[in-house]
């Protein structure tokens, strides 16, 4: 167990191999977000669908910091918000609203990540949204959609609008709120968010010198990048993911407990 992690009974060997792997990968995502400083204490969430017809998914125990989360501490719920297995923890209602919406609507959305980073929230509140300023932004823009702010996501009726605005894209800017990434794998979900968060940070820094002083990427270059990334984040993410896990093993061990 990692230093500082809350005590949790290990579920290894007590759940299916598929569920255990989803738990380990999801716990890794939480730890990676914490390592990059993109967490917001207990107030954002990442989820993973468990393979199987039940459409159960895993999400963080409400009250646990991202750097404390382990594979065994994650909470399993159904699409109605019912906790499936006995646990001392419960879940964030706003997290359930957002994540249940995407998991129910998108079969390819095995992992869903929602963050409130400073740079992500800042760009979500910018009237022009994410601008084609950098290579990072050009990579994510073709997969980026927008959802207008409706208040804290406690209204279950908002789920339909979140899903409609996301459509078949992989990334969503929640206006005045934050960012969201979906992926068929933990690696794809992570890499999409990594590029989006980097693009947002770069935009905030660039605009600090004034909107009139920044140079947008030429239209031809934007089109070229769109063609070049046709292979998607899945393959690239698969190449980067093992290195991410090695970094966790060095700097945040215990996530797979």
Curated annotation (Swiss-Prot):
Binds 1 zinc ion per subunit. Keywords: Metal-binding, Zinc. It comes from the Bacteria. Zn(2+) binds at residues 114, 116, 177. The keyword Zinc applies. This is Putative aldolase class 2 protein CC_1201. Its cofactor is Zn(2+). GO terms for cellular component: cytoskeleton. Belongs to the aldolase class II family. SMART domains: Aldolase_II. One of its GO terms (molecular function) is metal ion binding.
């Amino acid at each position: 167990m990692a230093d500082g992690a809350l005590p949790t009974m290990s579920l290894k060997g007590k759940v299916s191999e598929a569920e255990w792997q989803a738990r380990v990968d999801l716990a890794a995502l939480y730890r990676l977000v914490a390592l990059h400083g993109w967490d917001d204490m207990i107030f954002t969430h990442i989820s993973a669908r468990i393979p199987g017809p039940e459409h159960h998914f895993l999400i963080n125990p409400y009250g646990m910091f991202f750097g404390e989360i382990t594979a065994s501490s994650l909470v399993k719920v159904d699409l109605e918000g019912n906790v499936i297995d006995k646990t001392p923890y419960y879940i964030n209602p706003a997290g359930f609203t957002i994540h249940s919406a995407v998991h129910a609507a998108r079969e390819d959305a095995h992992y869903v990540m929602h963050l409130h980073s400073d740079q992500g929230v800042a760009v979500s509140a910018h009237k022009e949204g994410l601008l084609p300023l950098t290579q990072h932004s050009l990579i994510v823009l073709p997969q980026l959609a927008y959802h207008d702010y409706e208040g804290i996501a406690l209204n279950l009726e908002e789920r339909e609008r979140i899903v409609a605005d996301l459509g078949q894209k992989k990334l969503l800017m929640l206006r005045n709120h934050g960012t969201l990434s979906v992926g068929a794998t933990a690696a794809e979900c992570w890499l999409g968010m990594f590029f989006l968060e980097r693009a947002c940070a770069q935009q905030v820094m660039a605009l600090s010198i004034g909107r009139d002083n920044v140079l947008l990427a030429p239209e031809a270059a934007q089109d070229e990048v769109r063609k070049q990334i046709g292979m998607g984040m899945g393959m690239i993410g698969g190449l980067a993911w093992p290195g991410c896990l090695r970094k966790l093993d060095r700097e945040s061990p215990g996530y797979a407990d």
